[in-house]
Amino acid sequence: MADDKILARIAALLRQAEGTDNTHEAEAFMAAAQRLATATSIDLAVARVHSASRTAAQAPTQRTITIGEPGSRGLRTYVQLFAGIAAANDVRCDVASNSTFVYAYGFPEDIDASHALYASLVVQMVRSCDAYLATGAHRPTPTITARLNFQLAFGARVGHRLAQAREEAKQEATTDRRTAPGTALALRNKEVELRDHYRRSSEARGTWQAARASSGYSSAARRAGDRAGRQARLGASPELPKSRNRLSR
């Protein structure tokens, strides 16, 4: 992120969220982390509008985010989690055909924030899923089916929560009559610049979907994953562009 101190503050909020057993406190810390990321992104967007010159660090970029090793099971659920977080932070994604990595397109500060949130939430997702499976409540559904359904529901709920926090931060930034017009213009310019960058840079073909019919369905695991997502210590788009290239084995 352009300001390492801001990224450190976001990381501190995430650590506080992970360290409390109080669900309401955890939600407050996670939402605060997302609002801080959004507010910082807005401030930088406004600053770019008024900057006479631009550096590479102030322009949209592309970054590769590693999700997992080829052949690993459940990678789609990890991709969905990252995609939901990315969408809440104005980052667009192309997904490798084997779901082992994601190309993230966005401004550096937004990709940094997305990665920090993902690093915290993916641990929580796996931990809460393991705890659910350990109870045996998913039986007779196969464990892998239950895990996939749990984690898909977790990612979808978290993405929704982060999107809400983002909208709250944007509304707060655009309510001041003195600064609202300039802020709205900066956000619109940012949206257009990111869209143009994505169109120039992306080589995606086809679409990517998190869920597959062959994976099976478990309503109980979905409900459990949704509950865990609601309680996660702080999406997703159902379809994302699929990258043409696969990660080399």
Predicted regions and their residues:
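Long alpha-helical, hydrophobic tracts
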Residues: 1-62
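Extended, helix-rich structural scaffolds rather than catalytic motifs
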Residues: 3-4, 42-249
